[in-house]
């Protein structure tokens, strides 16, 4: 499959998804940053204003493995929330395979990780730790590992 076909699949899901909201007010806590990042990514998709290339081949096995990893995460952490799971799945596929951005927004900080960007490269202080987790999405995230 190529990125055009993958984008079309993502777009078809997103165009019918109408439950996206931006948190009111401005907050720098990790959840608010992630929610806004996902919202603006969603808007980018439905407005078809993405900076990624749409003529690159993508390995179907990698995309399917990625989808399975998202499903696994949600079954472990939020079973039954299929609509939100699929929303996050398609946002994450878009970020990873089409626009090649970090799965977490630049500036997010938690006790477990911080994501930064330098010279158009993303860095994550948690990748080295979390990539060892079963079905970790870190395997596919473009962020590079960085020490604290």
Model regions and ranges:
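Cysteine-centered metal-binding/redox modules
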Residues: 5-148
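C-terminal, active-site-flanking charged/polar segments
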Residues: 1
